[in-house]
Amino acid sequence: MAIDIWDSDAIKELAGGWTDEEEQELIKDTRLREFTVEYLGRSWQDALKYSFLSADETNSGRYLRNIHMGDTIYCHIAGYGFLGIGICTSKAVYMKDFNVSVDGVSTPILKAPWINQDKKDQLVTEKEIFIGVDWKKSVPDESQGYWEKGMTSIPLVAYMLNDRTTHRKVAEHFGYQPEE
């Protein structure tokens, strides 16, 4: 009920205003976190090539926005397992605003040539959000995903696990050691 009467933009204006970047810096949690990102139905090869993950921001896809720069990401595809571990390098932005490196030139993802053009064509440009990922460990193909009995996955796009056992097993399997 309070959310219906609480207009954060009006409060911001009354208080003298501040930029979105200043607001994020104020509320930023400096502890780095670990997220699992579910990536079913999208091009894993292009995510590797262009260093990103994406999701439709409707429903649980909006949780991709909870991932901050520096957070660790464990990428999982249901039916295949864990495919990679990376570090988030940029906050979530809409597809039209996301750039990748093509032959050393910053290029909008919309204009970049994809390995799997059909998967790109299936994305709803106005709803798809992207984060940059520096892949530390990965497999080139979904069929090489890692999964074992007892591991945890949840049918949400981006989430944190209370029990770190799954992430520890994945890191060990991939030979991943976080940088200090």
Where do the protein language model's features map onto the residues?
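Contiguous surface segments at macromolecular interaction interfaces
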Residues: 1-34, 58-59, 97-180
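Short, surface-exposed beta-edge/turn micro-motifs
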Residues: 32, 69-73, 82-83, 128
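Short coil-to-beta transition motif at edge beta-strands of beta-rich domains
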Residues: 63-77
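Beta-strand cores of modular interaction/reader domains in eukaryotic scaffold and signaling proteins
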Residues: 74, 87, 132-134
